[in-house]
Amino acid sequence: MSLFDHSVSELHKKLNNKEISVTDLVEESYKRIADVEDNVKAFLTLDEENARAKAKELDAKIGAEDNGLLFGMPIGVKDNIVTNGLRTTCASKILANFDPIYDATVVQKLKAADTITIGKLNMDEFAMGSSNENSGFYATKNPWNLDYVPGGSSGGSAAAVAAGEVLFSLGSDTGGSIRQPAAYCGVVGLKPTYGRVSRYGLVAFASSLDQIGPITRTVEDNAYLLQAISGLDRMDATSANVEVGNYLAGLTGDVKGLRIAVPKEYLGEGVGEEARESVLAALKVLEGMGATWEEVSLPHSKYALATYYLLSSSEASANLSRFDGVRYGVRSDNVNNLMDLYKNTRSEGFGDEVKRRIMLGTFALSSGYYDAYYKKAQQVRTLIKNDFENVFANYDVIIGPTTPTPAFKVGEKVDDPMTMYANDILTIPVNLAGVPAISVPCGFGANNMPLGLQIIGKHFDEATIYRVAHAFEQATDHHTKKASL
């Protein structure tokens, strides 16, 4: 039995009782990485020397009264979250040798909580993708079946947890990039409310949509991690000055009287029968615990995909303009003048999907097209947000599938961008509205790959979605199933 089969609270107790050491936890992580990483390919960079030194330092503090629950816990960090002195590439060749000179706020918070960073995790380049096949280095595989994708863009973050390489990880979610891979890999992934967690030190893809969040084996562990990284940050102008409650206090298993909304659009056209049936089965479980549900409509959700790709690509076009070979990152050797420097550095450094989205965004923002595309997309975004607010006026949570289907095979959709984009039709509206949502395991498809249940909450009401997710988790055994890698 792996140490990572235990929860954070169980491991904390074992540490305090000196049944295990922090070094044991770190070595467990690196041993597992040595055993499976050649197949899974979840990591881009390991930090073994520093992690082992930190473990030795923390071993001397075991038993101290001020040791928090995350003391000594091994974590993986998505490679678009900057880490001081530890290579951060965004899985792009243009940043292949970039060593940041500061830590992201979430990394600072986790260091203050005495977690240990095991390494940086693979992803779709600049977080643009749904399968991890867009990494500029190599594709991560799904631990449940190596012929299948782990999802994206936080595929490395989800795969590392599912494979038992780390206890938990950080991902980022712009249109579903935490929840979709969590669903595909059979783990728990939360996208917090926009502004709940600082984005300072997150390399921007789409600044009005990006949000950092936790990926874990259980809902309880997820709540521990969110508790540690949440809160106002003066270094992030979009960080919200909203009190962070005690997420653990609400994990009572009680959902009696809970009002659940189920959008008909989330069980209709484009959603597979397996995903639909898994949600209906989950609703039956929650009904048996005293919750009620009704069908509702999010009428503008059918426009979410087009709206998202116009807005996110426009923001990416602006954000990625900084990668030009002048200040940092890879610089092309094929340069005769300044224009060559810009053009060749970006042409050689960016992958196809990143170029595709930059081109789309630049077009949408260009003179003569701005009103027809970008401005119109912003107006539709407001309508989508209003749809959520209207539903939440009468219901506590919204529930549906995380993805239309289970994970698909490697190479199956990589040459068809529109089919690939459609994997995110159920997660994208949440980002456009800025509300929080969690994906928890809820069954398996005919291909024996995991399915995820998406629970969506009101702005800054992560406590309620944790309560519902935990109650469902404890009433079922889906979270106890593990990839037999």
UniProtKB/Swiss-Prot annotation:
Xref: SUPFAM superfamilies: Amidase signature (AS) enzymes
Keyword hit for DNA-binding: no
EC number: 6.3.5.7
Record keywords: ATP-binding, Ligase, Nucleotide-binding, Protein biosynthesis
Database matches in Gene3D superfamilies: Amidase signature (AS) domain
Pfam families registered for this protein in UniProt: Amidase
GO CC entries: glutamyl-tRNA(Gln) amidotransferase complex
GO molecular function annotation: ATP binding; glutaminyl-tRNA synthase (glutamine-hydrolyzing) activity
Superkingdom as given in the UniProt entry: Bacteria
GO BP term, pick one: translation
Reaction it catalyzes: L-glutamyl-tRNA(Gln) + L-glutamine + ATP + H2O = L-glutaminyl-tRNA(Gln) + L-glutamate + ADP + phosphate + H(+)
Catalytic residues as annotated in Swiss-Prot or TrEMBL: 78, 153, 177
Assembly mode: Heterotrimer of A, B and C subunits.
Protein purpose: Allows the formation of correctly charged Gln-tRNA(Gln) through the transamidation of misacylated Glu-tRNA(Gln) in organisms which lack glutaminyl-tRNA synthetase. The reaction takes place in the presence of glutamine and ATP through an activated gamma-phospho-Glu-tRNA(Gln).
Entry similarity comment: Belongs to the amidase family. GatA subfamily.
Protein's name in the database: Glutamyl-tRNA(Gln) amidotransferase subunit A
Species the sequence originates in: Bacillus anthracis
